[in-house]
Regions:
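Non-Sec secretion/translocation targeting segments of pathogen effectors
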Residues: 1-19
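Short, compositionally biased leader-like segments
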Residues: 14-40, 102
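Divalent-metal-activated hydrolytic enzyme cores
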Residues: 15-23, 27, 124-205
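Charged, amphipathic alpha-helical segments
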Residues: 34-52, 109-114
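A short catalytic or substrate-binding loop motif that flags glycine-/basic-rich loops and adjacent residues
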Residues: 55-59
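Short beta-strand scaffold segments in enzyme catalytic cores
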Residues: 61-68, 127-130
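Short amphipathic beta-strand/extended segments with alternating polar/hydrophobic composition
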Residues: 73-82, 86, 137-144, 151
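Short HxH-centered metal-ligating active-site micro-motif
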Residues: 74-123, 131-132
């Protein structure tokens, strides 16, 4: 039997929510190594760092910022279970075509509105989020720029907060993840972004 989110999606009530500001914590840490022989080697390392943090005794968000042209780790940050503030990223000399941000999501799997804000407002070209099993969701910049990106981002952000209020706050995390996956698929092209994930918003049973 197939369960699809799509037919029931329009029943969600649209409620404009103003998000509260949350104090974010982060610490910059040294990479365990920086002698990568290939981009695959670099990604394998970054993925392990992110997933190991989620599966630790006290799960936290670990972020690895990489340059895929040089195959180097530019910086690593650790946060808490909900946030990882990227202090100092705006001062880094980042290659706008080859900088990718990889991080873990201890709470919620899909790319978040904060992740989308990062890719829209920094030289980062891709943001990848992992869950505890190493499954990913990815958002990347496209060449064509879209007008009214700020308006579209705001629509996306509000819809994400609606889903959190409707589902996540009630413990419906699996449905919430699938709903947010669908919402980003809808809004990403309108923001000039490409979105991919390897977990589906349609659950087969």
């Amino acid at each position: 039997m197939k369960f699809s989110l799509l037919p029931s999606f329009n029943i969600f009530k649209r409620t404009k929510v103003t998000p509260a500001k949350v104090k974010q914590t982060s610490t910059i840490v040294e990479p365990l190594r920086n002698d990568f022989t290939s981009t695959k080697d670099l990604f394998t390392y970054a993925r392990k760092r992110c997933v190991d943090a989620i599966n630790s005794d006290k799960p936290y968000e670990h972020t690895v910022l990489v340059d895929t042209k040089k195959n180097k780790v530019m910086a690593e940050f650790i946060g808490d279970a909900n946030h990882c503030n990227l202090d100092g990223i705006e001062k880094m000399q980042l290659d706008k075509d080859n900088t990718i941000l990889l991080h873990g999501h201890p709470v919620g799997t899909p790319i978040s509105s904060a992740d989308v804000s990062t890719i829209l407002n920094t030289p980062v070209t891709q943001v990848i989020a992992f869950d505890k099993d190493g499954k990913f969701s990815l958002v990347a910049k496209k060449i064509d720029k879209k007008p009214n990106v700020s308006k579209e981002f705001n629509n996306f952000r509000l819809e994400q907060y609606d889903l959190a209020d409707e589902m996540a706050d009630n413990g419906q995390f699996e449905l919430y993840n699938k709903a947010t996956d669908y919402v980003l698929k809808k809004h990403a092209p309108l923001m000039g972004l490409r979105y991919l994930s390897n977990y589906a918003y349609v659950l087969k049973k």
